[in-house]
Amino acid sequence: MDIFKELILKHTDENVLISPVSILSTLSILNHGAAGSTAEQLSKYIENKNTPKDDKDDNNDMDVDIPYCATLATANKIYCSDSIEFHASFLQKIKDDFQTVNFNNANQTKELINEWVKTMTNGKINSLLTTPLPINTRMTVVSAVHFKAMWKYPFSKHLTYTDKFYISKNIVTSVDMMVSTKNDLQYVHINELFGGFSIIDIPYEGNSSMVIILPDDIEGLYNIEKHITDENFKKWCSKLSTKSIDLYMPKFKVEMTEPYNLVPILENLGLTNIFGYYSDFSKMCNETITVEKFLHKTFIDVNEEYTEASAITGVFMTNFSMVYRTKVYINHPFMYMIKDNTGRILFIGKYCYPQ
Protein backbone atom coordinates (compact mmCIF):
# COMPACT_ATOMS: atom_id res chain seq x y z
CA MET A 1 0.00 0.00 0.00
CA ASP A 2 3.05 2.26 0.00
CA ILE A 3 2.46 3.70 -3.48
CA PHE A 4 -1.20 4.30 -2.65
CA LYS A 5 -0.28 6.12 0.57
CA GLU A 6 2.18 8.34 -1.30
CA LEU A 7 -0.49 9.20 -3.88
CA ILE A 8 -3.22 10.09 -1.40
CA LEU A 9 -0.83 12.51 0.30
CA LYS A 10 -0.57 14.34 -3.03
CA HIS A 11 -4.28 14.04 -3.90
CA THR A 12 -5.97 14.71 -0.57
CA ASP A 13 -9.37 15.78 -1.93
CA GLU A 14 -9.48 13.66 -5.07
CA ASN A 15 -10.57 10.17 -6.02
CA VAL A 16 -7.52 7.91 -6.24
CA LEU A 17 -7.27 4.50 -7.90
CA ILE A 18 -4.26 2.31 -8.68
CA SER A 19 -3.55 -1.32 -9.46
CA PRO A 20 -0.63 -2.61 -7.34
CA VAL A 21 -0.55 -5.84 -9.37
CA SER A 22 -0.09 -3.95 -12.63
CA ILE A 23 2.63 -1.70 -11.22
CA LEU A 24 4.50 -4.68 -9.78
CA SER A 25 4.25 -6.51 -13.09
CA THR A 26 5.80 -3.55 -14.90
CA LEU A 27 8.64 -3.31 -12.38
CA SER A 28 9.28 -7.01 -12.97
CA ILE A 29 9.67 -6.34 -16.69
CA LEU A 30 12.30 -3.71 -15.89
CA ASN A 31 14.04 -6.12 -13.56
CA HIS A 32 14.73 -8.50 -16.45
CA GLY A 33 17.06 -5.87 -17.94
CA ALA A 34 18.53 -4.50 -14.73
CA ALA A 35 22.01 -5.06 -13.30
CA GLY A 36 24.06 -3.91 -10.33
CA SER A 37 22.37 -1.72 -7.72
CA THR A 38 19.38 -1.18 -10.03
CA ALA A 39 18.68 -4.92 -10.02
CA GLU A 40 19.25 -5.10 -6.26
CA GLN A 41 16.69 -2.36 -5.58
CA LEU A 42 14.11 -3.81 -7.97
CA SER A 43 14.55 -7.38 -6.71
CA LYS A 44 14.24 -6.33 -3.09
CA TYR A 45 11.11 -4.27 -3.73
CA ILE A 46 9.45 -6.98 -5.82
CA GLU A 47 10.25 -9.72 -3.31
CA ASN A 48 8.79 -7.63 -0.47
CA LYS A 49 5.62 -6.83 -2.40
CA ASN A 50 5.06 -10.13 -4.15
CA THR A 51 3.57 -13.35 -2.72
CA PRO A 52 3.63 -13.59 1.08
CA LYS A 53 6.79 -15.27 2.38
CA ASP A 54 5.05 -18.41 3.54
CA ASP A 55 3.57 -18.91 0.06
CA LYS A 56 6.79 -18.38 -1.90
CA ASP A 57 8.52 -21.16 -3.73
CA ASP A 58 12.27 -21.51 -4.05
CA ASN A 59 12.72 -20.38 -7.62
CA ASN A 60 14.08 -16.99 -8.59
CA ASP A 61 11.53 -16.11 -11.22
CA MET A 62 10.62 -12.46 -10.76
CA ASP A 63 7.52 -12.43 -12.95
CA VAL A 64 4.35 -11.43 -11.14
CA ASP A 65 1.59 -13.97 -11.66
CA ILE A 66 -1.79 -12.40 -12.30
CA PRO A 67 -4.27 -14.58 -10.38
CA TYR A 68 -7.38 -15.89 -12.09
CA CYS A 69 -10.32 -13.54 -11.90
CA ALA A 70 -13.38 -13.14 -14.13
CA THR A 71 -11.76 -11.05 -16.88
CA LEU A 72 -8.57 -9.20 -16.01
CA ALA A 73 -6.56 -7.58 -18.78
CA THR A 74 -3.29 -5.94 -17.83
CA ALA A 75 -1.66 -3.49 -20.20
CA ASN A 76 2.03 -3.26 -19.37
CA LYS A 77 4.54 -2.29 -22.00
CA ILE A 78 7.97 -0.76 -22.49
CA TYR A 79 8.51 1.56 -25.43
CA CYS A 80 12.14 2.19 -26.38
CA SER A 81 13.93 4.12 -29.09
CA ASP A 82 14.38 2.23 -32.37
CA SER A 83 17.97 3.44 -32.52
CA ILE A 84 19.00 1.12 -29.68
CA GLU A 85 19.91 -2.53 -30.21
CA PHE A 86 18.59 -4.65 -27.35
CA HIS A 87 20.00 -7.96 -26.14
CA ALA A 88 18.18 -11.00 -27.49
CA SER A 89 18.08 -12.54 -24.00
CA PHE A 90 16.16 -9.52 -22.68
CA LEU A 91 13.70 -9.50 -25.58
CA GLN A 92 13.09 -13.21 -25.13
CA LYS A 93 12.20 -12.74 -21.46
CA ILE A 94 9.75 -9.87 -21.93
CA LYS A 95 8.19 -11.15 -25.17
CA ASP A 96 5.25 -8.93 -26.19
CA ASP A 97 5.84 -6.38 -23.44
CA PHE A 98 8.42 -4.51 -25.51
CA GLN A 99 8.26 -2.36 -28.65
CA THR A 100 10.69 -0.04 -30.39
CA VAL A 101 9.40 3.31 -31.65
CA ASN A 102 10.71 6.50 -33.20
CA PHE A 103 10.33 9.12 -30.47
CA ASN A 104 11.26 11.83 -32.99
CA ASN A 105 7.80 11.26 -34.43
CA ALA A 106 6.15 12.30 -31.18
CA ASN A 107 2.51 12.44 -32.31
CA GLN A 108 2.63 9.08 -34.07
CA THR A 109 4.20 7.46 -31.01
CA LYS A 110 1.56 9.00 -28.75
CA GLU A 111 -1.23 7.62 -30.94
CA LEU A 112 0.45 4.21 -31.12
CA ILE A 113 0.63 3.96 -27.33
CA ASN A 114 -2.92 5.23 -26.83
CA GLU A 115 -4.37 2.83 -29.39
CA TRP A 116 -2.63 -0.12 -27.72
CA VAL A 117 -3.94 0.89 -24.30
CA LYS A 118 -7.46 1.34 -25.68
CA THR A 119 -7.35 -2.15 -27.19
CA MET A 120 -6.00 -3.76 -24.02
CA THR A 121 -8.69 -2.16 -21.85
CA ASN A 122 -11.63 -2.83 -24.18
CA GLY A 123 -12.01 0.88 -24.84
CA LYS A 124 -12.42 1.88 -21.19
CA ILE A 125 -9.15 3.82 -21.15
CA ASN A 126 -9.00 5.77 -24.38
CA SER A 127 -5.87 7.84 -23.87
CA LEU A 128 -2.97 7.23 -21.57
CA LEU A 129 -0.97 10.08 -23.08
CA THR A 130 -2.66 13.44 -23.47
CA THR A 131 0.44 15.18 -24.84
CA PRO A 132 3.30 13.88 -27.02
CA LEU A 133 6.39 12.61 -25.26
CA PRO A 134 9.57 14.73 -25.55
CA ILE A 135 11.60 13.81 -28.63
CA ASN A 136 14.63 13.07 -26.43
CA THR A 137 12.73 10.25 -24.72
CA ARG A 138 14.66 6.98 -24.89
CA MET A 139 12.37 4.74 -22.92
CA THR A 140 8.84 4.87 -21.50
CA VAL A 141 7.01 2.42 -19.26
CA VAL A 142 3.21 2.46 -19.38
CA SER A 143 0.70 0.52 -17.30
CA ALA A 144 -3.06 0.22 -17.70
CA VAL A 145 -5.56 -2.33 -16.37
CA HIS A 146 -9.08 -3.47 -17.21
CA PHE A 147 -11.19 -5.88 -15.15
CA LYS A 148 -14.85 -6.82 -15.23
CA ALA A 149 -16.68 -9.01 -12.71
CA MET A 150 -20.34 -9.65 -11.99
CA TRP A 151 -21.61 -9.29 -8.44
CA LYS A 152 -22.35 -12.57 -6.68
CA TYR A 153 -25.56 -10.93 -5.48
CA PRO A 154 -26.53 -8.17 -7.94
CA PHE A 155 -28.20 -5.02 -6.66
CA SER A 156 -31.83 -4.60 -7.71
CA LYS A 157 -32.08 -1.82 -10.28
CA HIS A 158 -35.65 -0.97 -9.30
CA LEU A 159 -34.47 -0.20 -5.76
CA THR A 160 -31.83 2.33 -6.82
CA TYR A 161 -32.77 5.82 -5.69
CA THR A 162 -31.28 9.31 -5.40
CA ASP A 163 -29.69 9.95 -2.03
CA LYS A 164 -27.27 12.32 -0.34
CA PHE A 165 -23.50 11.83 -0.35
CA TYR A 166 -21.57 13.86 2.19
CA ILE A 167 -18.27 15.00 0.66
CA SER A 168 -17.69 16.69 4.01
CA LYS A 169 -19.88 17.81 6.90
CA ASN A 170 -20.62 21.03 5.04
CA ILE A 171 -20.65 19.85 1.42
CA VAL A 172 -23.40 17.53 0.20
CA THR A 173 -24.13 16.19 -3.26
CA SER A 174 -26.45 13.52 -4.67
CA VAL A 175 -25.70 10.02 -5.94
CA ASP A 176 -27.59 7.03 -7.30
CA MET A 177 -27.75 4.78 -4.25
CA MET A 178 -27.91 1.04 -4.92
CA VAL A 179 -29.67 -1.28 -2.48
CA SER A 180 -29.04 -4.92 -1.61
CA THR A 181 -30.93 -6.48 1.28
CA LYS A 182 -30.94 -9.68 3.32
CA ASN A 183 -27.58 -10.92 2.07
CA ASP A 184 -25.12 -12.77 4.30
CA LEU A 185 -21.87 -10.84 3.90
CA GLN A 186 -18.56 -10.65 5.71
CA TYR A 187 -18.66 -7.62 8.01
CA VAL A 188 -16.90 -6.16 11.05
CA HIS A 189 -16.90 -2.88 12.95
CA ILE A 190 -13.46 -1.84 14.20
CA ASN A 191 -12.68 0.61 16.99
CA GLU A 192 -9.18 2.08 16.95
CA LEU A 193 -7.72 5.01 18.87
CA PHE A 194 -7.88 7.11 15.69
CA GLY A 195 -11.59 6.32 15.15
CA GLY A 196 -14.16 3.68 14.35
CA PHE A 197 -14.97 2.22 10.95
CA SER A 198 -16.82 -0.61 9.24
CA ILE A 199 -15.37 -3.16 6.83
CA ILE A 200 -17.60 -5.10 4.47
CA ASP A 201 -16.55 -7.72 1.93
CA ILE A 202 -18.84 -7.76 -1.13
CA PRO A 203 -18.28 -10.83 -3.35
CA TYR A 204 -18.20 -11.15 -7.11
CA GLU A 205 -18.84 -14.28 -9.11
CA GLY A 206 -15.66 -16.32 -9.16
CA ASN A 207 -12.80 -15.75 -6.78
CA SER A 208 -12.80 -12.02 -6.13
CA SER A 209 -14.53 -9.38 -4.01
CA MET A 210 -14.60 -5.69 -3.13
CA VAL A 211 -13.72 -4.66 0.40
CA ILE A 212 -15.12 -1.35 1.61
CA ILE A 213 -13.65 0.55 4.57
CA LEU A 214 -16.18 3.14 5.75
CA PRO A 215 -15.29 5.50 8.62
CA ASP A 216 -17.95 6.25 11.22
CA ASP A 217 -17.22 9.95 10.94
CA ILE A 218 -18.02 11.74 7.68
CA GLU A 219 -14.54 13.27 7.69
CA GLY A 220 -12.81 10.25 9.22
CA LEU A 221 -11.19 8.80 6.09
CA TYR A 222 -7.98 10.80 6.56
CA ASN A 223 -7.21 9.03 9.85
CA ILE A 224 -7.69 5.63 8.20
CA GLU A 225 -5.41 6.68 5.35
CA LYS A 226 -2.68 7.57 7.84
CA HIS A 227 -2.87 4.18 9.56
CA ILE A 228 -3.61 1.82 6.67
CA THR A 229 -0.81 -0.70 6.10
CA ASP A 230 -0.71 -4.20 4.68
CA GLU A 231 -0.38 -5.54 8.22
CA ASN A 232 -3.28 -3.50 9.62
CA PHE A 233 -5.50 -4.39 6.68
CA LYS A 234 -4.86 -8.12 7.20
CA LYS A 235 -5.43 -7.76 10.95
CA TRP A 236 -8.73 -5.96 10.49
CA CYS A 237 -9.98 -8.38 7.82
CA SER A 238 -9.14 -11.35 10.05
CA LYS A 239 -12.00 -10.18 12.28
CA LEU A 240 -14.64 -10.35 9.54
CA SER A 241 -17.62 -12.58 10.25
CA THR A 242 -20.84 -13.38 8.45
CA LYS A 243 -23.77 -11.08 9.14
CA SER A 244 -27.08 -10.37 7.48
CA ILE A 245 -26.59 -7.01 5.78
CA ASP A 246 -28.81 -4.37 4.22
CA LEU A 247 -26.30 -2.55 2.02
CA TYR A 248 -26.72 0.95 0.59
CA MET A 249 -23.88 1.70 -1.81
CA PRO A 250 -23.45 4.47 -4.40
CA LYS A 251 -23.00 3.73 -8.06
CA PHE A 252 -19.71 5.29 -9.03
CA LYS A 253 -17.30 5.60 -11.89
CA VAL A 254 -13.73 6.85 -11.72
CA GLU A 255 -11.46 7.56 -14.67
CA MET A 256 -8.27 9.52 -14.25
CA THR A 257 -8.12 12.50 -16.60
CA GLU A 258 -4.32 12.38 -16.45
CA PRO A 259 -2.14 9.33 -15.81
CA TYR A 260 -0.05 9.18 -12.67
CA ASN A 261 3.67 9.64 -13.23
CA LEU A 262 5.04 7.33 -10.56
CA VAL A 263 8.72 8.29 -10.94
CA PRO A 264 8.94 10.58 -7.86
CA ILE A 265 6.90 8.16 -5.75
CA LEU A 266 9.05 5.16 -6.66
CA GLU A 267 12.15 7.22 -5.89
CA ASN A 268 10.71 8.10 -2.47
CA LEU A 269 10.20 4.39 -1.83
CA GLY A 270 13.86 3.59 -2.45
CA LEU A 271 13.89 2.79 -6.17
CA THR A 272 16.34 5.60 -6.88
CA ASN A 273 18.53 3.71 -9.32
CA ILE A 274 15.97 2.99 -12.01
CA PHE A 275 15.92 6.64 -13.00
CA GLY A 276 18.70 9.02 -13.92
CA TYR A 277 22.49 8.78 -13.86
CA TYR A 278 22.87 5.73 -11.61
CA SER A 279 20.45 3.44 -13.44
CA ASP A 280 21.98 0.25 -14.82
CA PHE A 281 20.02 -1.57 -17.50
CA SER A 282 23.05 -3.19 -19.10
CA LYS A 283 21.16 -6.49 -19.42
CA MET A 284 18.83 -4.69 -21.84
CA CYS A 285 21.45 -3.21 -24.15
CA ASN A 286 25.05 -2.00 -24.36
CA GLU A 287 24.07 1.67 -24.34
CA THR A 288 23.40 3.78 -21.27
CA ILE A 289 19.63 3.95 -20.86
CA THR A 290 17.30 5.11 -18.12
CA VAL A 291 13.56 5.18 -17.53
CA GLU A 292 12.13 8.59 -18.42
CA LYS A 293 8.47 8.03 -17.55
CA PHE A 294 6.51 5.53 -15.49
CA LEU A 295 2.85 6.15 -16.31
CA HIS A 296 -0.15 4.48 -14.71
CA LYS A 297 -3.84 5.01 -15.43
CA THR A 298 -6.93 3.18 -14.24
CA PHE A 299 -10.71 3.09 -14.65
CA ILE A 300 -13.51 1.70 -12.51
CA ASP A 301 -17.27 1.47 -13.02
CA VAL A 302 -19.42 0.16 -10.17
CA ASN A 303 -23.13 -0.40 -10.88
CA GLU A 304 -25.98 -2.74 -9.97
CA GLU A 305 -24.80 -5.66 -12.11
CA TYR A 306 -21.02 -5.56 -12.14
CA THR A 307 -17.77 -3.80 -11.39
CA GLU A 308 -15.58 -2.99 -14.35
CA ALA A 309 -11.82 -2.76 -13.76
CA SER A 310 -11.81 -4.44 -10.37
CA ALA A 311 -12.08 -7.83 -8.55
CA ILE A 312 -12.27 -9.49 -4.99
CA THR A 313 -13.62 -12.60 -2.87
CA GLY A 314 -16.37 -13.40 -0.30
CA VAL A 315 -17.53 -16.23 1.98
CA PHE A 316 -21.24 -16.94 2.35
CA MET A 317 -23.07 -18.88 5.05
CA THR A 318 -26.73 -19.63 5.67
CA ASN A 319 -28.19 -18.83 9.05
CA PHE A 320 -31.54 -20.47 9.68
CA SER A 321 -32.34 -18.63 12.91
CA MET A 322 -33.88 -15.19 13.36
CA VAL A 323 -31.18 -12.65 12.46
CA TYR A 324 -30.79 -8.95 13.17
CA ARG A 325 -29.81 -7.25 9.95
CA THR A 326 -27.01 -4.68 10.01
CA LYS A 327 -27.63 -1.62 7.85
CA VAL A 328 -24.57 -0.17 6.11
CA TYR A 329 -24.98 3.24 4.46
CA ILE A 330 -22.02 4.18 2.28
CA ASN A 331 -22.90 7.86 2.01
CA HIS A 332 -19.57 9.60 2.66
CA PRO A 333 -15.90 9.17 1.59
CA PHE A 334 -14.61 5.62 1.79
CA MET A 335 -11.69 3.42 0.83
CA TYR A 336 -12.02 0.27 -1.26
CA MET A 337 -9.82 -2.64 -2.25
CA ILE A 338 -10.37 -5.31 -4.84
CA LYS A 339 -8.68 -8.56 -4.02
CA ASP A 340 -8.59 -12.18 -5.07
CA ASN A 341 -9.14 -15.10 -2.74
CA THR A 342 -5.43 -15.30 -1.85
CA GLY A 343 -5.68 -11.81 -0.38
CA ARG A 344 -3.67 -10.17 -3.13
CA ILE A 345 -4.89 -6.62 -3.79
CA LEU A 346 -5.57 -6.02 -7.48
CA PHE A 347 -6.89 -2.48 -7.06
CA ILE A 348 -6.97 0.00 -4.23
CA GLY A 349 -8.72 3.35 -4.22
CA LYS A 350 -10.52 6.00 -2.27
CA TYR A 351 -13.79 7.61 -3.31
CA CYS A 352 -14.48 11.04 -1.90
CA TYR A 353 -15.92 13.11 -4.74
CA PRO A 354 -18.75 11.90 -7.03
CA GLN A 355 -17.97 12.75 -10.64
From Swiss-Prot:
The record marks 320-321 as: Reactive bond. Keywords: Host cytoplasm, Protease inhibitor, Serine protease inhibitor. The keyword rRNA processing does not apply. It holds the Pfam family Serpin. It is found in: Host cytoplasm. The gene is SPI-1. The keyword Translocase does not apply. This viral protein may be involved in the regulation of the complement cascade. One of its GO terms (cellular component) is extracellular space. It comes from Cowpox virus (strain Brighton Red). This is Serine proteinase inhibitor 1. Its main location: host cell. Belongs to the serpin family. Poxviruses subfamily. PROSITE patterns: SERPIN (PS00284). InterPro entries: Serpin_CS (IPR023795), Serpin_dom (IPR023796), Serpin_fam (IPR000215), Serpin_sf (IPR036186), Serpin_sf_1 (IPR042178), Serpin_sf_2 (IPR042185).
